[in-house]
Amino acid sequence: MGIGSYHEPVLAAEVLQLLVRMPGVYVDGTLGGGGHSLAILEELERKGFLADSFLIGIDQDDHALKAASEKLSGFSGSTAIIKGNFSAIAAIVRKISAERHFTDSVAGILLDLGVSSAQIDTPERGFSYMRSGPLDMRMDPEAESSAADLVNTLSERELVTLFFRYGEEPRSRSIARGIIDYREKHGSILRTEELAEIIRLREARPDRVIKTLSRVFQALRVEVNRELEVLEQVLADGASLLSAQGRLAVISYHSLEDRMVKSFFTAQSSSDWGPRGVGLTEPLKKAEFAVVTRKPVASGQQELSLNPRSRSAKLRVLEKLA
C-alpha cells in the first residue's frame, strides 16, 4: 500500500500561542503524523514546562500511529501514544492518569478535525475523488462499514437525506437518482472513480463539479465515521476534563463541524439567567467556561501558500474558568 506523507500541522503557531500556557497534561485527540504533538512538546520544553508535563496522543489509524511514534521518539518519556477514537478521550485520560499516577484533569486538548493529507493522498484509503481506489473512507480500517456499503445499500431517499444533511449538496436528488440508475444497470459501485463519474454526469455546470464532488464525498465520510456524533461527545467529555485555566482547541474544516463547535462553546460560556422576565440580579448558574476566540482563527497568507489545504481551517478555543 502506498502511504501518503503528513503535511505540516495546520495553524501550528496559533495553536501553541493559545493552548500551551502552563505545565500539565496535554491531549492531542487527533494525533495523525504527530506534527502538532511535536510542536506542543517542543513548546513545553522551550518554556521550561516539560519536566512537569505529559502528552497523550490518540489516533485510530495504524499508519498514523507508526508515523507519530517515529516523530515523537525524542520525547518518548513524556508521551503515551494510544490507538483509539477520540470519542473515548475521557476513559483514555483516566486510564493513563491512573497508570502514570498523575491528575486526570488536563491543561490542554487539541482536536484537529477532518482527514489528514496522508489519508487523502493514499489511494487505497478511498477518501479522494481525485485518486483511483476502493470506495472505503474508513478512518479506522478495521471498522465494519465503508462508503461502498452505504452507496450500494441505501435507498434513494436515504441517499438524498445523507448528501443534503452532511454535504449540504443542493443537487442531492439528482445525484441519488444517478447512483440508483447505475446500480440498476451496472451493479455495485466499488471504486472512487465510478462514483466520481456518476456525480460528474449529474452536474450540468462544469464550474460546480469540484464543489459537488467535495460535498458528496464529505457526506459519505462523515456518515462512515460518525464524525458529528463523535464530535458532539468529545466536545462534552473534553471540556469536562479541563483543569482551571485549561483550554480546548478545535480546528474544523467545514461548516457542519464549525457550527457544532461554535454552538457548544457558546452554550458552555453562557450563564443561566432563568426564564425571561424573572429579573434576576445574579445568574442561577455562572458560566464555567469562556470563549477565548470570539472569531475563529484562520490561516494567514504565508501558511496558505505553503499548505493550500489549510484554507478552510478554523480554530476556536474554549477556556475553563478558575
From Swiss-Prot:
Class of the enzyme per the UniProt entry, highest EC level: transferase
GO BP: any one term: rRNA base methylation
Classification via SUPFAM superfamilies: Putative methyltransferase TM0872, insert domain, S-adenosyl-L-methionine-dependent methyltransferases
Entries under InterPro entries matching the protein: RsmH, SAM-dep_MeTrfase_MraW_recog, SAM-dependent_MTases_sf
One MF term in the entry's GO annotations: rRNA (cytosine-N4-)-methyltransferase activity
Coiled coil segments of this chain: none
Domain of life (superkingdom): Bacteria
Keywords: Cytoplasm, Methyltransferase, rRNA processing, S-adenosyl-L-methionine, Transferase
Gene3D superfamilies tied to this protein: Putative methyltransferase TM0872, insert domain, Vaccinia Virus protein VP39
EC number from the UniProt entry: 2.1.1.199
Alphabetical list of Pfam families matching this protein: Methyltransf_5
Family: Belongs to the methyltransferase superfamily. RsmH family.
Protein name: Ribosomal RNA small subunit methyltransferase H
Native source species: Chlorobium limicola (strain DSM 245 / NBRC 103803 / 6330)
Lineage: Bacteria, Pseudomonadati, Chlorobiota, Chlorobiia, Chlorobiales
